[in-house]
Design a protein with these regions (language model features):
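Calcium-binding acidic motifs and repeat modules
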Residues: 1-179
Length: 179
């Protein structure tokens, strides 16, 4: 911050966002993260993250923890352009009434009610994995591949509901599943 006379100061400003998980408001940012290399999920905590993403559709990009470069986020490519820049492309709880997590939100896309997201579901082709290899929070060429391109045939929509806290407390997992 600088004043008109040229004096300046640098200070860290932390903000905390509280989300009201009700039917009528944003349910927060609880993305489905995929372990792509089989060694468990890795996350970059907020203090080490360079990622800013508009998580609540208010036009402001918030500083957030992020999936590690070897893992990926499940995304809904709403425009089919492999550009992921809207919260509704990365956060799915808003799509299913009563969903608290994004894995629960995916039930809205399970059109044949078999508790799987697979090719038998109408919008399976619209889902992809975003592997942000350079951890900048921007979906760039080669980072967003369809589930089919990734060799993912199905995602189980039931969680083990075993919570975990990772990335120095910056990431709260609400459970795991398989694909």
């Amino acid at each position: 911050v600088a004043d008109g006379a040229g004096a300046d100061t640098r200070a860290r400003i932390d903000t905390t966002y509280y989300y009201n998980y009700s039917e009528d408001t944003d349910r927060g940012f609880l993305p489905v993260t995929l372990d792509l290399n089989g060694n468990g999920l890795d996350f970059t905590g907020i203090d080490d993250s360079n990622v800013y993403f508009d998580v609540n559709n208010d036009g402001w990009r918030e500083h957030i923890a992020w999936a590690g470069a070897q893992d990926g986020l499940l995304v809904l490519d709403t425009e089919g352009d492999r550009t992921i820049d809207k919260p509704e492309e990365i956060s799915f709880a808003r799509y299913h009434p009563g969903a608290v997590t994004d894995l629960e939100g995916l039930l809205a896309f399970d059109t044949n009610d078999d508790s799987l997201l697979d090719r038998l579901d109408a919008r399976f082709k619209d889902f992809a994995v975003w592997q942000d290899k350079n951890l900048n929070g921007l979906s760039e060429e080669g980072e967003v591949l369809t589930l089919t391109e990734r060799g993912i045939e199905s995602i189980h929509l039931a969680s083990d509901r075993l919570p975990q806290t990772l990335a120095n407390g910056d990431v709260q997992l609400f459970g795991t599943s398989t694909y």
